[in-house]
């Protein structure tokens, strides 16, 4: 069974995409995210604690207002090298049409060099549900109630 396919409009802002480097693509048949590349002119070294805003070389438009996109880190970069997103997760609204930028942050202990064309993040398109706020005085009781951080334990 194949997943539903929706269009994602992109503008190529860096002519190396689609020629020198592939366009954003899914790495495997079951990948949830499209790999995004660093559209750099030269290698860039991030020393520990540094954050930089990188171009992906594309602009996107989701078109469908029932969708959003999130920019997520690549697990290997974070685990092996300490390279994560500077803003945690990037949220892209369906009506955004500007350049797709990625904030990368070196939270590791060693300098890390990003080469032009390196895969630096992934883009996942998700359905959204818009809500209408209902102001209430009390909530209907749930099994958890107001139990917060650590409430359910670790075992």
Curated annotation (Swiss-Prot):
Pathway listed for it? Pyrimidine metabolism; dUMP biosynthesis; dUMP from dCTP (dUTP route): step 2/2
Keyword annotations from UniProtKB, A to Z:
Hydrolase, Magnesium, Metal-binding, Nucleotide metabolism
Q: What class of enzyme is it?
A: hydrolase
- The protein's Enzyme Commission number: 3.6.1.23
* Source domain of life: Bacteria
Where do the annotations place substrate binding? Answer: 74-76, 87, 91-93
Annotated GO MF terms = dUTP diphosphatase activity; magnesium ion binding
Q: What GO biological process terms are annotated to this protein in UniProt?
A: dUMP biosynthetic process; dUTP catabolic process
Look up keyword Ribosomal protein and say if it applies: no
What is the protein name given in its UniProt record?
Answer: Deoxyuridine 5'-triphosphate nucleotidohydrolase
Q: What is the lineage of its organism?
A: Bacteria, Pseudomonadati, Pseudomonadota, Gammaproteobacteria, Lysobacterales
